[in-house]
């Protein structure tokens, strides 16, 4: 979706400009550019009707009270990629998946990185909150540029981290984000939530499990 990329680039420029400018007139111009970016986005992607197809979760695009201008102006400081962390949990040759309440499809457990937590802490917490299983992070398997993979178009630029986690206990549990949890083998993959994980990524995680000496992937 090329127009979404234009809006993202405009948002990045205006966010940096507002961060560093000391001139009141320049600030006004950057704010006008934000309004223009929001108008462009709204013309082809109304924020309340395209949340799922743009790969949004939570407050990103799903709240009906938000507008594109609210979303664009919510980000402060120099624009940097967001980080999504996924837990890769194996049991008997199968991987742990959770069924997303947002779209009814399946994903490796995980979510946006929070300030104040390391990637390992985020992976462990997300797995526990979304599936009920207690795990211990053991290895960073991959760091991917989301835009280089077969995900649906998304407004926020994002890096995805896949963290191997060892299963220590717990039991299947649901949450406000989770409809179900289950383990699936490489030849029995469920319908995947494409904004969160792709089939190619999941199959690569199985390769990492089969060959634990593989180095961390990155692109």
Question: What is the predicted function of each stretch?
Answer:
Residues 113-137, 145-205, 210, 214-219:
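Unchanged
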Residues 6, 29, 197-201:
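Short, hydrophobic-biased amphipathic alpha-helical segments
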Residues 24-28, 154:
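Short, solvent-exposed positions on alpha-helices
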Residues 109-111:
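Extended, positively charged loop/linker patches that create polyanion-binding surfaces
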Residues 50, 69-107, 135, 139:
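N-terminal strand-loop-strand
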Residues 31-53, 58-86:
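Acidic, metal-coordinating catalytic segment for phosphate/diphosphate chemistry
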Residues 1-25, 38:
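Long amphipathic alpha-helical segments
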């Amino acid at each position: 979706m090329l127009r979404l990329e234009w809006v993202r680039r405009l948002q990045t420029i205006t966010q940096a400009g507002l961060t560093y400018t000391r001139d009141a007139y320049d600030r006004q111009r950057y704010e006008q550019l934000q309004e223009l970016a929001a108008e462009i986005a709204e013309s082809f992607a109304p924020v309340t009707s395209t949340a799922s197809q743009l790969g949004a979760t939570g407050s990103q695009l799903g709240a009906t009270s938000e507008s594109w201008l609210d979303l664009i102006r919510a980000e402060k400081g120099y624009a940097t990629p967001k980080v999504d962390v996924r837990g890769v949990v194996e049991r008997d040759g199968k991987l742990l998946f959770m069924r997303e309440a947002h779209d009814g499809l399946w994903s490796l457990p995980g979510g946006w990185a929070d300030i104040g937590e390391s990637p390992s802490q985020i992976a462990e917490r997300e797995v526990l909150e979304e599936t009920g299983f207690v795990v211990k992070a053991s290895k960073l398997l991959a760091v991917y540029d989301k835009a280089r993979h077969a995900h649906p178009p998304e407004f926020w630029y994002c890096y995805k981290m896949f963290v191997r986690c060892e299963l220590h206990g717990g039991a299947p549990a649901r949450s406000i984000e989770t409809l179900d949890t289950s383990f699936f083998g490489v030849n029995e993959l469920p319908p995947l939530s494409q904004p969160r994980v792709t089939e190619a990524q999941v199959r690569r995680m199985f390769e990492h499990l089969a060959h634990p000496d593989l180095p961390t992937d990155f692109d």
